[in-house]
Amino acid sequence: MNKHVEAEWRFPAKTAWAIFAAMIFGNFMAILDIQIVASSLNEVQAGMSASRYEVTWVQTVYLIAEIIAIPMSSIVSRVLSTRVYYTMCAIGFTVSSLLCALSWNLESLLVFRGIQGFMGGGMIPTSMTALYLLFPEPKRSLPLVMFGMISTLGPAIGPTIGGWLTNNFSWHWMFLINIIPGIIIATVIYSGPNIDRANYSLIKSMDWFSLVGMAMFLGGLEYFLDEGARHDWLADTGVRIAFMVCVVGGMIFFSRSFTQPKPLLDLSVFKNKNFTLSAITTFVIGMALYGLGYMIPVFLGQVREMNSSQIGHVMMVTGIVMFCFAPFLAWLIPNFDTRKTVFVGMILAGFGVWLNSHLSIHSDYDFMFWPQIYRGIGLMICLIVVSHLAMSTLPLSKVADASGIYNLMRNIGGAVGLALINSSLDWLTAMHVTQINQSMTPQNWIFTERLDQLTAQYQEVGTNAQQIALSVIYRDIHFQALTSSFNDLLRMLAIIMFVTAFLTIFMDRGKK
């Protein structure tokens, strides 16, 4: 920070830690609930009697609501105060979690899931803002580590926890586990001191056109990115409407943000070089975090045919590594050049992704182990230290807006990454299937030998033995093509991460 930041405690240390601990646990629940349903969509689909497409909205509606709420949290927390706003979000998140578990059909679940996402989206940036308000500059390393640890741990272990709860109890418990912690968090925050003062006069000067424009822009963008890949982009009416809503909303929001004397969201933070480069970096981190959290479980489920518990067992390595390595960063941040630290972290994470890009149809836990180790350490370094670089050169008055934008960039990065993965996966798989099929000729002795073996194996079935053998071979071809497609995407992601690492050359060191 700069001269505006106080060097002394504004509150007793125990009070500051109690408030912050409650806030980051709420932050953990909000981030966890993004991915907790990922490994249990089949069970939710069966419970709600929904189609495979309809049930994907359980995730989509949460993300749309969350991505709208994140930047809005800045202005609302200034109007109501951080304490009151966070308490309202915690209560809303808890009540909506209960209602999700009590949903009587898919439509009601989606409504309550949207409320849950909106309330969770308010908690995430508010807890980052509180970090800078609660702790003096010399004492921020450990809180930053804890914040980063929670931000990465949620997506990493969400599918594991969701799969375990669903297999051992029912899918309803993915939401019921939020109730008791939510009540405790709301009580602790509301009973604590005011971190800042409410300013109700801001309501009179609030730019409501910008607010509507921002909601249209972000909601339309999230829908366009999430649903476009599934429906051939602008060929679908709903996706076209979302794109137009996004464009119109963006024109309203950005035009007013640069022309109004008191804009809804202060975009001048992008004039700060460190913040802009850090925002780009966290965008790529979002692509990696959410993209890998999607690709690896899909590979394990579709190609390796693992169930949700087995997938969770493989994926938990990353979460454990992140959790164990995070405390080390509290010592690393004040003692090393943070730019070099981010460079090493991004290269290490990219190296882990590159190692993962050698998947085969036989890849298992042992193959995934070391790539997850490197990736977990690298991503944890980047998430924590990049947030320090982004915020440490900004005045305290700009932190609320900056934290909302910074967290938004990571979420948009994740949405863009998932959209690119989904849209690329189909045509890459089709390309690899064509390439493999071209080699499946009578002159290919591997193909003919495999066909003869399978035909002999299925002779007992009857006269369709060769047809059954061919269907098995074509299934294996699809699995091989899908695996090759994942490898292509993983290599591209690794290259993007390697290139992004060099942005640190242009950053300032930032305050320790």
Swiss-Prot record:
CDD domains per UniProt: MFS_LmrB_MDR_like
Keywords: Antibiotic resistance, Cell inner membrane, Cell membrane, Membrane, Transmembrane, Transmembrane helix, Transport
Annotated TM spans: 17-37, 55-75, 84-104, 115-135, 144-164, 169-189, 205-225, 234-254, 280-300, 314-334, 341-361, 376-396, 412-432, 486-506
Tagged with keyword Transport: yes
InterPro entries recorded: EmrB-like, MFS, MFS_dom, MFS_trans_sf
Domain of life (superkingdom): Bacteria
KW Transmembrane (keyword) present: yes
A Pfam family hit: MFS_1
A GO cellular-component term linked to this record: plasma membrane
SS bonds (residue pairs): none
MF (Gene Ontology): transmembrane transporter activity
Stimuli inducing this protein: Cotranscribed with emrA. Induced during osmotic stress.
BP-aspect Gene Ontology terms: response to antibiotic
Location of this chain's protein in the cell: Cell inner membrane
Topology of the protein relative to the lipid bilayer: Multi-pass membrane protein
Disruption phenotype: Deletion of the gene significantly slows cell growth in 20% sucrose. The mutant is more susceptible to colistin, nafcillin, paromomycin, spiramycin and D,L-serine hydroxamate than the wild type.
Function of the molecule: Probably part of an efflux pump system that contributes to adaptation to osmotic stress and resistance to colistin.
Homology family: Belongs to the major facilitator superfamily. EmrB family.
NCBIfam families: efflux_EmrB (TIGR00711)
Protein name according to UniProt: Colistin resistance protein EmrB
Species, as recorded: Acinetobacter baumannii (strain ATCC 17978 / DSM 105126 / CIP 53.77 / LMG 1025 / NCDC KC755 / 5377)
Lineage: Bacteria, Pseudomonadati, Pseudomonadota, Gammaproteobacteria, Moraxellales
